[in-house]
């Protein structure tokens, strides 16, 4: 995969040289090219922004540098057309499914906006995707690009040492991931669940699935409605619902039995 990133702060993308994304580049699985948008300006001040029409605070990124940059990048490989991604709080929410979709693309171009955003005409002309990584506002699109690229890169063939790691991740099956444990067996008086030490792979799988369901119900109940559930899953959910009904606190509020009491 090739990924081009256009930004006015190229140094912001240095973390792409590290960890999984860095190793993917070393292996040739991923090629990342970072571009300074100011290279496509034509004035002595290398201006990339201007006041917004209609008034209001802040500045808007001008269309000319963006159009010149994207035109030149796209022309660098005439045989292919890149998928252009604009990180923005106004975009559709990013998810694991979206990462899987982008991981199938041979070429991505990320446009990192700043100030009050990029002139809407650039978005209308060039953007294939407008993506939001959450309901909050950042100073620019660079952090969102780092998030999206890492989520995508780890899905590329050979990037993870164990391909099962991606398959077992949170959201890969629509649920949050089950809790994980390692040595020592007992830490601060808390022992690793016996089933994980049993050597019974089927029992371990059942335990992890049940814990994933419990965790998802407690933290992201919206995901349960979208997940593909088996009869065994529904039995776990029925049991969880029954436990919650029996776990009323003195104030009348109901607390899930897996909720850790902060006073303990």
UniProtKB/Swiss-Prot annotation:
Coiled coil spans: none
InterPro entries for this protein: Alpha/beta_knot_MTases, tRNA_m1G_MeTrfase_C_sf, tRNA_m1G_MeTrfase_TrmD, tRNA_m1G_MTases_N, tRNA_MeTrfase_TRMD/TRM10
Localization of this protein: Cytoplasm
The protein's enzyme class: transferase
Annotated region described as Disordered, given as residue ranges: 244-264
The protein's Enzyme Commission number: 2.1.1.228
Keywords for this protein: Cytoplasm, Methyltransferase, S-adenosyl-L-methionine, Transferase, tRNA processing
Binding positions for S-adenosyl-L-methionine per the UniProt entry: 113, 133-138
Source organism superkingdom: Bacteria
GO CC annotation: cytosol
Any one GO MF annotation of this record: tRNA (guanine(37)-N1)-methyltransferase activity
Catalytic activities: guanosine(37) in tRNA + S-adenosyl-L-methionine = N(1)-methylguanosine(37) in tRNA + S-adenosyl-L-homocysteine + H(+)
Pfam family, one: tRNA_m1G_MT
Entry's Gene Ontology BP terms: tRNA N1-guanine methylation
SUPFAM superfamilies found in the cross-reference section: alpha/beta knot
Subunit structure: Homodimer.
Reported function: Specifically methylates guanosine-37 in various tRNAs.
Family, similarity comment: Belongs to the RNA methyltransferase TrmD family.
NCBIfam families hit by this protein: PRK00026.1, trmD
Name used for this protein in its record: tRNA (guanine-N(1)-)-methyltransferase
Organism field: Frankia alni (strain DSM 45986 / CECT 9034 / ACN14a)
Lineage, opening ranks: Bacteria, Bacillati, Actinomycetota, Actinomycetes, Frankiales
